[in-house]
Amino acid sequence: MDPKKIARINELAKKKKTEGLTAEEKVEQAKLREEYIEGYRRSVRHHIEGIKIVDEDGNDVTPEKLRQVQREKGLHGRSLDDPNS
């Protein structure tokens, strides 16, 4: 997210505590917060999708739901053509 938008979120939060927000500022704040949260969710999702879990013996124990997402995206050598990957 653009640093200017984050600064604006913080500015609106500070103003809300000190003097309150106008109706337009409340709408702007809600929109900016939603944009920030969506970006955060995308980042976390991307990070989790890149994880491969192995046990002490080196066996892949990644949950099947995550494996399916990785197959669809071709991550960690997984392929839709090979259901065992």
Swiss-Prot record:
Comp. bias regions, Basic and acidic residues: 62-85
GO cellular-component term (any): cytoplasm
Source taxon at top rank: Bacteria
Annotated Gene3D superfamilies: Helix hairpin bin
Alphabetic keyword roster: Cytoplasm
Record keyword Ribosomal protein present: no
Compartments (UniProt record): Cytoplasm
Residue span of region Disordered: 56-85
InterPro entries hit by this protein: DUF896
Predominant subcellular localization, coarse grouping: cytoplasm
Keyword Mitochondrion: no
NCBIfam families: PRK02539.1
Family named by the database record: Belongs to the UPF0291 family.
Name of this protein: UPF0291 protein SGO_0570
Organism: Streptococcus gordonii (strain Challis / ATCC 35105 / BCRC 15272 / CH1 / DL1 / V288)
